[in-house]
Regions:
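A residue-level marker of the well-folded mature domains of exported/periplasmic proteins
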Residues: 1-268
């Protein structure tokens, strides 16, 4: 199609999708006008987190449309967080600032399973419900709801896919996001538990981004030390994309990644 016709068709498709999703919202649930949703993410950069933000913004638009809120009554949303998932201090400081503004609800994804305890308690004391997404916290009694992947199952599925590819014997490396993140912990646990059924498979290296100075160089070093490596499990977008960007030479072990970025899809 000519560009102008293609753009028009795409616009109509998007509009139709928005109308459908808005019509599915149960408006019998009471929502206060001018409600403020504060989102503090593990990170703001990266394809995965940009998609998370887009999904949240679309949901807010759908709610405002379904409830027919006027411009003065509309629900609003802010989306903040560090640019890097490993910047735990910035996330904690952002949570402090956001809670001080007393939002209607706080949504967060925890970079460190333990680091946000004081902030969760402060939110609870101020009557601010907390919804956690992607990566949970240790004290879920302070959490109203959690929405995320079954991370242990994701790890199990990754192990099964590698076994399908390499058979029941081989050497595996695990390249993971920060060890203190709940999603990373569960994915690695699920992966290891699934591989425990195969005596001929060994995990020869286990790296975490918060345990090495340069993750890219650390992964490259593993490939040099184990030229006969059979498989690699990368637990999130950042690590998977970083690994795919390495010069692996003739050594091309099977790789399974999480988050399905465009880089991973292109590699497949």
């Amino acid at each position: 199609l000519p560009d102008n016709e293609k753009a028009q068709n795409e616009s109509e498709e998007v509009t139709g999708e928005e109308e459908d999703s808005a019509s599915k919202i149960d408006t019998s649930i009471t929502i206060g006008t001018e409600s403020r949703i504060a989102v503090v993410s593990k990170a703001t950069d990266g394809e995965y987190w940009k998609l998370v933000r887009q999904g949240m913004e679309d949901a807010v638009k759908d709610i405002n449309k379904a409830y027919e809120f006027s411009s003065d009554d509309e629900i609003s949303m802010t989306f903040e967080g560090p640019s890097d998932e490993q910047d735990i201090e910035t996330q904690v400081n952002t949570l402090d600032a956001v809670i001080a503004e007393n939002p209607t609800v706080l949504c967060m994804s925890a970079s460190d399973i333990e680091s946000c305890q004081a902030q969760l308690e402060a939110a609870s004391e101020n009557g601010i419900p907390v919804v956690v997404f992607d990566s949970n916290v240790s004290d879920d009694e302070l959490v109203a709801a959690f929405r995320g992947t079954d991370n242990a199952y994701a790890g199990k599925l990754a192990a099964e896919k590698i076994v399908d590819a390499i058979g029941e014997n081989g050497k595996i490396a695990v390249f993971s996001a920060q060890e203190k993140t709940e999603s990373s912990q569960k994915r690695v646990e699920g992966f290891k538990e699934a591989l425990a059924d195969y005596e001929g498979i060994s995990i020869v290296s286990e790296l975490y981004t918060d345990k090495v100075k340069d993750m890219s160089e650390a992964m490259a070093d593993v490939l040099r030390r184990y030229p006969d490596l059979d498989g690699v499990f990368c637990t999130n977008e950042d690590v998977a994309d970083m690994y795919l960007g390495l010069d692996k030479g003739e050594n091309t072990p099977v790789m399974v990644g999480v988050d399905a970025t465009s880089v991973q899809q292109k590699a497949i």
